[in-house]
Amino acid sequence: MINDVISPEFDENGRALRRIRSFVRRQGRLTKGQQLALDSYWPVMGVEYQAAPVDLNTLFGREAPVVLEIGFGMGTSLVTMAANNPQQNFLGIEVHSPGVGACLSSAHDAGLSNLRIMCHDAVEVLENMIPEASLDMVQLFFPDPWHKARHNKRRIVQTPFVELVKSKLKVGGVFHMATDWQPYAEHMLEVMSGVSGYLNLSEQNDYVPRPDSRPLTKFELRGQRLGHGVWDLMFERKE
């Protein structure tokens, strides 16, 4: 599970298959609690990557709206949302194993049955595992902004990714993004506005107020006290 975050980067002839990725693989050191959670709860809540579509109703054992979160960090907000919305199914994707372990532990403590976790490249999951027009919401909160200009190409929000997300959303489904880096917020808005088939849910056609459905993190609360801004964007699939 942990050692298969990305698919092979070379084909059988040794040709590079690698694409530009929005994350850097850093294994990190697992605490004893995180390792215990991985050993104990991954068999219940963990989902192994496969290069074929998965039936989401079968995955969760029921039919319900599905929310996909990309890059959930330590899982605090994701677990809170899943606990607050038992009528929805939540699928979280994170590439760093300490975060996966922490999220599994918190989800177990909360007694959640509507949360599944993956440890893999989210782009590959979207491309190969998620059926077309199957998601009610995709959440991307505080992705790496890749501040330096020469690294901007690593930002996950690019036109091909936005098109991919749209294809996986149901008509009426929503792509919700949040960032605390204004240049990235402006980049998100520019990219999203350039892709047809989306409707910006902002009345001013830019950013929306933070919806109550997105919990405030400790990091965000600290930023607010320091006067830092946060920008939320919500776009609905219209076609």
Swiss-Prot record:
S-adenosyl-L-methionine binds at E69, E94, D121, D144. SUPFAM superfamilies: S-adenosyl-L-methionine-dependent methyltransferases (SSF53335). Residues 150-155 are annotated as: Interaction with RNA. This is tRNA (guanine-N(7)-)-methyltransferase. Disulfide bonds: none annotated. It comes from the Bacteria. Catalyzes the formation of N(7)-methylguanine at position 46 (m7G46) in tRNA. Substrate binds at K148, D180, T217, K218, F219, E220. The lineage of its organism: Bacteria, Pseudomonadati, Pseudomonadota, Gammaproteobacteria, Enterobacterales. Belongs to the class I-like SAM-binding methyltransferase superfamily. TrmB family.
